[in-house]
Structure formats: structure tokens, C-alpha cells
Regions:
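Surface-exposed binding/hinge segments that line
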Residues: 39, 50, 85-132
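Long beta-strand-rich cores associated with HINT superfamily self-processing modules
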Residues: 447-473
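Gly/Pro-rich hinge or "lid" segments in bacterial periplasmic/extracellular proteins
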Residues: 24-26, 121-177, 181, 298
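N-terminal lobe/hinge region of extracytoplasmic solute-binding protein
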Residues: 1-42, 73, 148-150
């Protein structure tokens, strides 16, 4: 559970492991989960969580504060998954158990978002993992194929290339889930997912498919396509530190070469709303006065003319299995061809993409993807995508601006939303003016399920993939 962080692979974390607090419903609310309550010290640097008593791991042993401490230490040690969320806030060795059912986090600095991020402190059975450690690997090889959680379901089979199978854990602290078994399968082809749902091979599938496929599903009498407003930003990540993208003129040329109206109105059938900056429009802290960029090849050419030399061929990446990502890459290539910029497309699967994003040498020139909601706060977008300390983490554009860092640090240290909001608004304005990325639209969630499925609880954090609430008639 500490090896990955993306929403594409959140299902096994949500269903097989538990966290201190959990985001539920839409608009998302942060609810007690393993922790019944928490307190914050006056200086905002010490968080103390009181745990539920009697919570069981899948092997029947009790979950205690020592397991929470071990889980945080493990996140910091393996440096994967949610590590970027905590690396700048929590020092190794600073988290401690205060008795059997309380845990204390001692932060390096006050943080307005720490409680919100504890949704991603998935707690593992420390005794079980320790027994399976090899050469100081924190049990990474073992846990990749085995279960060490307390969640609503017990992993029975896990294969990154195929998906996972899990069975109900009857002793979960909230009681047993409704479904006896859940089976998440990796199916790369959109058409195969659609046909499988129509035939009844699956009970639910991908909520972010191309609009023509959503319409196809909406026309089937045996299916129900749920709709909900979300906070999931679709954008193009531009490598800001590699030539020619390190020239603001070329980044602006890229922004002017994308056909926003054609994308939103024609390809997506007006199912989404334009988002001109880094923070989704529905989120507080999103400015209302950022006009953004339009599709204007003449302006793109004018900015290219201001460059010291003509741009080289650039690589535009999309993600295999995510049709919109690949379509958007092709649309930008079309605009760049009109602007006289050579480019080539490279579509790769998400595990390959996510590894390359963490390495500035391997990162693509331009990559189309989504920034999902990991915690309901503007820092989830502005801070994670733009702060210099998120290089090799969420900031795969390797954007860096000292003024933006200063504004983000000030916002993070202040618990007052009214004071934080204008700081994030200014960050969004600056990154738009500097063309830090190509910001395109906020996404709507379309959840396709068979009509015999009920109890779906959509939350933007996790995209409605928590299965304990579902029933099948």
C-alpha cells in the first residue's frame, strides 16, 4: 500500500487497508476511520490521534499505535507512494506511540493540510511485515504479493498486469461489507471494457471514458451511468527545465497550439468545463479572473519567432488505456504542425509513465494526464504540482519559481482559509502567466454500473472505488 499513490491503483489500498481518517462522499468530508479523534497543539506542529480499540488485522491480531508508527516510518524509508506528501513534514523517528491507542506526529513545521493527508497513511500489520523483511527491504518484496491489512477485504490474488481478487473480511471494525468478493481486472482496451459491461462480464467500469462510449452505455437499458461533479484537472505537464520548454515563449506557443474549443465542444461533447489554471474551478482558492490561453496559431508562431533558435522535435506523450490522454496528445501535435513545430507521439502504459515522471532525465517533453484529488484542498493541485520541493514527486514539470514557493509555504503554514485562499489564487495566476502547464478542463465523473448494483458512494478522493458500500441484487 506504500508503493503506489495514483488513483488508477487506489482500489486495493481503499478496500484492503485502513487509514487514520478517510475522505467520504461528495463534496468530500474527512471522517474518523481508524482514529476516533485527533488534537492539534497550539503551534500547529504536534498532531495526536486517538485510535479505535479492538480493530483487527486480517490475521486476527489487534491494530495498535505501534503499527501506525511503523507504517509512517515505512513510508519515509521506502520513499515511494505517498512519500512526497510527508517527506517535507515528518522526520524519520519523530512519530511515536503514546500508549497503546494514541499516536503522536511531530511535524517539522505547522501544516494546514496534515490531517487531510492522513487518509494516505495506510496502516500495515507491523509484526507480520517485519517477519517477512529481507535485507532491510521493509518487506517490499513480500507485501507486493501478500496481505498485511485490516481493510474491508482480504487480498487473495494480486498481479499488477491483471488486477486483484479479494474476499470479505467479516471482522472489520465497521462490520462486514455487503459483497462477499471483489475482482478488479486490468483491461486496457476501452471497447473491451464497454462490451464487457454490456454483456454482464463486469458490474462496473472506468468512469472517465471517451464521451461517445459514455453515450453508448447510457443507451443500454441494463446499465446506469451515474454523474457527479468532480475536482480532477486534465492538463498537459510541460518539462520546464529542458530546452526548448525552458523558454517561456515556447511554453506559451504550446499553450496557444491546443484547440480547447474543439476538444471540449466536439471531442468531449460539452460534457466538461474549461479550466484555465492549475486549481479546479469548484475548489476554494481558484481565481475567477484568469483568462488563460486560446487556440491561436498566429500567437504561437509569434512566440516561436522570439526564441533564439527554432525548436527541435518534441515528444508528446499519452497513456495507453486512457483514450482521452492519447487523443489530446494527437490534437496538440496537429496544432504544433500548423505552427511549424516538429513533434512525435509516444503512448506508454501508466506504470512506465509514472516511473519516468519521477526522473527529470526520463520525463517526457509534454505529457497529458489528470491531477486527481488526493485531499480536498487547493494545495493538492497548486502545491503538489508547482512547489520546488515536489520535484521527483507530484511536480513532474520540474517547474520552479521562488515567489510561488514563498506563497505556497505561507499558505501551508496558515490554518485560516480566508487568508490562504488569496495566496493560492496568486499562485494560479503566476503559473498561468508563465505557462507552467497546459491547463484544459475540470472533469466530470460518469460512473457506469449494471442496474442491479446499488450503494455506490462517489468521492473525488478515490473516484468511488471503495466497495464496502455496494450491493448487487
Amino acid at each position: 500500500p506504500h508503493a503506489t499513490f495514483d488513483v488508477g491503483r487506489v482500489a486495493y489500498r481503499l478496500n484492503c487497508y485502513d487509514s487514520l481518517l478517510r475522505w467520504l462522499d461528495n463534496p468530500p468530508k474527512l471522517e474518523p476511520w481508524l482514529a476516533e479523534s485527533y488534537t492539534v497543539s497550539e503551534d500547529g506542529k504536534r498532531y495526536t490521534f486517538k485510535l479505535r480499540e479492538g480493530v483487527k488485522f486480517h490475521d486476527g491480531t489487534e491494530l495498535t499505535a505501534e503499527d501506525v508508527v511503523y507504517s509512517m516510518e515505512r513510508i519515509l524509508a521506502v520513499k515511494k507512494g505517498a512519500y512526497p506528501l510527508f517527506a517535507t513534514l515528518v522526520d524519520p523517528g519523530s512519530t511515536r506511540a503514546v500508549g497503546k491507542y494514541a499516536v503522536e506526529f511531530n511535524l517539522k513545521a505547522a501544516s494546514a493540510i496534515f490531517a487531510a493527508t492522513t487518509h494516505d497513511v495506510y496502516v500495515v500489520n507491523s509484526a507480520l511485515v517485519k517477519r517477512n523483511e529481507r535485507n532491510g527491504d521493509w518487506g517490499q518484496e513480500w507485501i507486493a504479493r501478500n496481505d498485511a491489512g485490516s481493510g474491508s477485504y482480504i487480498i487473495r490474488r494480486f498481479d499488477p498486469a491483471r488486477g486483484f481478487l479479494a474476499s470479505r473480511f467479516d471482522d472489520h471494525f465497521l462490520g462486514p461489507a455487503n459483497l462477499a468478493e471483489i475482482d478488479f481486472r486490468y483491461v486496457a482496451e476501452v471497447n473491451s471494457r464497454v462490451l464487457g459491461l454490456i454483456r454482464g462480464d463486469f458490474q462496473g467500469t472506468d468512469p472517465y471514458m471517451p464521451q461517445d462510449q459514455i453515450a453508448r452505455l447510457q443507451g443500454d437499458a441494463n446499465l446506469n451511468v451515474m454523474e457527479a461533479e468532480s475536482t480532477r484537472l486534465f492538463y498537459a505537464c510541460i518539462h520546464n527545465q529542458r530546452a526548448p520548454m525552458n523558454d517561456v515563449n515556447f511554453r506559451k506557443a504550446l499553450c496557444y497550439s491546443f484547440d480547447y474549443d474543439g476538444w471540449i465542444n466536439d471531442i468531449l461533447g460539452k460534457s466538461v468545463v474549461r479550466n484555465t489554471h492549475v486549481i479546479p474551478n469548484p475548489m476554494w482558492g481558484a481565481p475567477k479572473d484568469v483568462a488563460g490561453y486560446t487556440y491561436d496559431i498566429d500567437k504561437a508562431k509569434a512566440h516561436i519567432a522570439q526564441m533564439a533558435s527554432p525548436p527541435r522535435e518534441i515528444v508528446i506523450a499519452g497513456m495507453i488505456g486512457y483514450e482521452q490522454s492519447m487523443q489530446a496528445a494527437a490534437l496538440l501535435q496537429n496544432g504544433l504542425t500548423r505552427a511549424g513545430v516538429p513533434s512525435r507521439l509516444l503512448n506508454e502504459p501508466w506504470p512506465v509513465v509514472s516511473n519516468k515522471m519521477r526522473d527529470p532525465e526520463q520525463m517526457y517533453d509534454v505529457l497529458f494526464l489528470w491531477r486527481s484529488t488526493y485531499y480536498a484542498d487547493p494545495h493538492n493541485w497548486a502545491g503538489e504540482l508547482l512547489h520546488t520541493n515536489r520535484h521527483r514527486g507530484g511536480n513532474a514539470s520540474y517547474y520552479s519559481n521562488p515567489e510561488v514557493d514563498r506563497l505556497l509555504n505561507e499558505a501551508l503554514a496558515n490554518a485560516d482559509q480566508e487568508k490562504r485562499a488569496p495566496l493560492y489564487e496568486q499562485v494560479a495566476r503566476i503559473s498561468s502567466e508563465e505557462a507552467g502547464g497546459i491547463y484544459i478542463h475540470n472533469t466530470k465523473w460518469f460512473g457506469p454500473y449494471r442496474k442491479n448494483v446499488s450503494g455506490v458512494r462517489f468521492c473525488p478522493i478515490g473516484d468511488g472505488q471503495e466497495m464496502r458500500w455496494l450491493s448487487i441484487a
